[in-house]
Amino acid sequence: MTVQTSKNPQVDIAEDNAFFPSEYSLSQYTSPVSDLDGVDYPKPYRGKHKILVIAADERYLPTDNGKLFSTGNHPIETLLPLYHLHAAGFEFEVATISGLMTKFEYWAMPHKDEKVMPFFEQHKSLFRNPKKLADVVASLNADSEYAAIFVPGGHGALIGLPESQDVAAALQWAIKNDRFVISLCHGPAAFLALRHSDNPLNGYSICAFPDAADKQTPDIGYMPGHLTWYFGEELKKMGMNIINDDITGRVHKDRKRLTGDSPFAANALGKLAAQEMLAAYAS
């Protein structure tokens, strides 16, 4: 007998009118173990350069009907790229706009993954006690030790990051100083912070989560309502080219901008980023 799982969003009792994804959508799009593989870096980086992770610090995303989607950074999209980069020798620091702790979509955590979960536990304090992004930005110069900025996905990236002057300043610094910018899924929404000032990403091509897919997710109860705006439309208005219109786990390199389309791209993006950064920084 087949057990039918509900497509109704699940109540998040920690906040009024807030919801987690439905049982059905979680059964389709999450797994207790990840697809982590290919972590093979026999000559890891041994220098001082590291990764700056710009993480989400807000959990609740309003939808068009007033209901709140309980979100944050997607664990797979955050941890798999970082696992590869760490294995390749690159340490990382975490910053949020407020300096308050990173919010994760714990309902997507691969809680039975014997590699990813110990990695998360090892670095949990970085996410619980991040730097304040404004303080990081104030210290940036041409000699700063950050080799890359990484903006993880999850719908939490739609909250605050697209309007942040500090996010814009960090991205402008990275691009001006020939650093890598790595992102996937909804993470590229952070690039919208550049639209109100100098936009060095005009003309770049990226992968990202398709707006068309976001418009379908309420049908299966992934979100409790529709988004009030769509980041892909806005990225195109600022001169960026989104090369995918579906979700296949695709990754893309445009100079030092490395992007992926979804959580299904997290492992491949991690491998791409590790390989590209080792090639750039290997002594």
UniProtKB/Swiss-Prot annotation:
Q: Which SUPFAM superfamilies match?
A: Class I glutamine amidotransferase-like (SSF52317)
Where does the record say this protein resides?
Cytoplasm
DNA repair: is it a keyword of this entry?
Answer: yes
Q: Identify the main location.
A: cytoplasm
Q: Report the catalytic activity.
A: N(omega)-(1-hydroxy-2-oxopropyl)-L-arginyl-[protein] + H2O = lactate + L-arginyl-[protein] + H(+); N(6)-(1-hydroxy-2-oxopropyl)-L-lysyl-[protein] + H2O = lactate + L-lysyl-[protein] + H(+); S-(1-hydroxy-2-oxopropyl)-L-cysteinyl-[protein] + H2O = lactate + L-cysteinyl-[protein] + H(+); N(omega)-(1-hydroxy-2-oxoethyl)-L-arginyl-[protein] + H2O = L-arginyl-[protein] + glycolate + H(+)
Q: What class of enzyme is it?
A: hydrolase
Keyword set, alphabetical order: Cytoplasm, DNA damage, DNA repair, Hydrolase, Metal-binding, Stress response, Zinc
Task: Tell me, using the record's free text, what induces this protein.
Answer: By heat shock.
What InterPro entries does UniProt report for this protein, alphabetically? Class_I_gatase-like (IPR029062), HchA (IPR017283), Prot/Nucl_acid_deglycase (IPR050325)
**Per the UniProt record, which EC number(s) apply here?**
3.1.2.-, 3.5.1.-, 3.5.1.124
The record's annotation in PANTHER family points to: PROTEIN/NUCLEIC ACID DEGLYCASE DJ-1-RELATED, PROTEIN_NUCLEIC ACID DEGLYCASE 1
- Family membership noted in the UniProt record: Belongs to the peptidase C56 family. HchA subfamily.
What this protein is called in its record is Protein/nucleic acid deglycase HchA
Q: What is the lineage of its organism?
A: Bacteria, Pseudomonadati, Pseudomonadota, Gammaproteobacteria, Enterobacterales
- The protein's gene is named hchA
